Amino acid sequence: MKIGCVKEIKNNEFRVGLTPDNVKAYIAAGHHVYIEKGAGIGSGFSDNEYVDAGASLIDNAADVWNLVDMMVKVKEPLESEYPLFREGLILYTYLHLAADKQQMDALLAGKVNAVAYETLQEKDRSLPLLAPMSQIAGRLSIQEGAKYLEKKFGGEGILLAGVPGTPKANVVILGGGTVGMNACKIAVGMGANVTILDISLKRLEELDNMFGAHIQTLVSNDSNVERVLKDADLVIGSVLIPGGSTPKLFKKKYLPEMKNGAVFVDVAIDQGGCGEASHVTTHDDPVYTVDGVVHYCVGNMPGAVPRTSTIALTNATVRYGLEIAAAGLEEACRKSEVISSGVNTYLGKLTNKNVASAHGYDYTDLASLI
């Protein structure tokens, strides 16, 4: 199979879909790999490293798109890339279609066979291709939130951990999954007061066992959320429905009751965000303020640390990519429910229930198409 990788064009996105080590793995399996020149520079991988690994360098992205059977990316294609879609092309990347109707329509119209990292699910219901970026985003959320609590950015002007004789910051984490747990780890490590909310008592028990007296755990409901937000200095939105639209737990009505200069980091923004006042921002212009609360809603947070995040992501993605390349997508889906769970569009049909529900579109069972 011909495998391709192009330079990411999203704002300040420096990750890359394939590393030189990934290229070696595909070449060893008998495939051909085509890399756009400069694709890996932002993550610290030179063109020469890709050539040494066995890849062919291509001068421009369009030629790579037109040449390959499977395109391996990091982030969703942008509108300028839609004309490069074609029937039968396998697109292997993050898609987040529940929050992006325009992209979904373009994939359906182009009859692209799109495999979304974020919906590929193992039998134990874990999300192996979402987990590494969730770990990084969770940790970054506290790092970024602490920065935007500084006065010059519109924050309260407080230090997360305080110093002797001053109060610590109150950190509230909405959602106790991978993002929330990693945010909790960093916030506790920095010495903040941490409260984490989740709808699952089992998950709260797990978090309590992990962090003990260092955190407070609460069942997530409107009353508890509203109560803890009044004293919050930093709020992390880390709610997830795999492939689906995120519930709006951080309501506009809470904002006037919060501290002036409090910070909200909406890590769920890729799936539409868990804040009613949330809209996507960029690394160039990451924050805005609503009713005195600073909102940080960057849609590609791990792109800020591309070396770490590229290696972490591709460590996970290469395994499934090799399975698809070896058998072809159709046969790979027949053999593996895990891979089939990642397929969001196939030959012009929408094959993910949560995405279909988010937009009111018809859902087609992938098994009926392969």
Predicted regions and their residues:
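An N-terminal-biased, well-structured beta-alpha scaffold segment characteristic
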Residues: K2-G110
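Rossmann-like adenosine-cofactor binding region
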Residues: N209-D291
